[in-house]
Curated annotation (Swiss-Prot):
Keyword Ribosomal protein: no
GO molecular function: DNA binding; structural constituent of chromatin
Domain of life of the native organism: Bacteria
GO cellular component: cytosol
Residue numbers spanned by region Disordered: 54-74
Annotated InterPro entries: Hist_DNA-bd (IPR000119), Histone-like_DNA-bd_CS (IPR020816), IHF-like_DNA-bd_dom_sf (IPR010992), IHF_alpha (IPR005684)
Lineage: Bacteria, Pseudomonadati, Pseudomonadota, Gammaproteobacteria, Pasteurellales
Gene source species: Pasteurella multocida (strain Pm70)
Function: This protein is one of the two subunits of integration host factor, a specific DNA-binding protein that functions in genetic recombination as well as in transcriptional and translational control.
GO biological process, one term: regulation of translation
UniProt-recorded name of the protein: Integration host factor subunit alpha
Subunit and interaction comment: Heterodimer of an alpha and a beta chain.
Length: 98
């Protein structure tokens, strides 16, 4: 199962008794704040959850999987998520789905 933004909004409606429009707006604004922070080069630290950070990847040689041809992979910036200790501990307690 995958948790979507719509389901997050539905959970806010149920748990916080928000109306649908406010819940959807809250979810959208939350993620927009994270996007804007990352776009401006800031790391995002969510206490008890984890950190979103920017990492610069250097250029490197790559390979086209279809042809086997060597192709350069250009330098780029990527977003990485590092879970916090509390999140890691809670996830480690869960049983894997079979």
């Amino acid at each position: 199962m995958t948790l979507t933004k719509v389901e997050l909004a539905d959970n806010l409606i149920e748990k916080l008794h928000l109306n649908k429009r406010d819940a959807k707006e809250l979810v959208e604004n939350f993620f927009e704040e994270i996007r804007v922070a990352l776009e401006t080069g800031e790391d995002v630290k969510l206490s008890g959850f984890g950190n979103f950070e920017l990492r610069d990847k250097s250029s490197r040689p790559g390979r086209n999987p279809k042809t086997g041809e060597s192709v350069p992979v250009s330098a780029r910036r990527v977003v990485a998520f590092k879970p916090g200790q509390k999140l890691r501990a809670r996830v480690e307690k869960t049983k894997p789905k079979s």
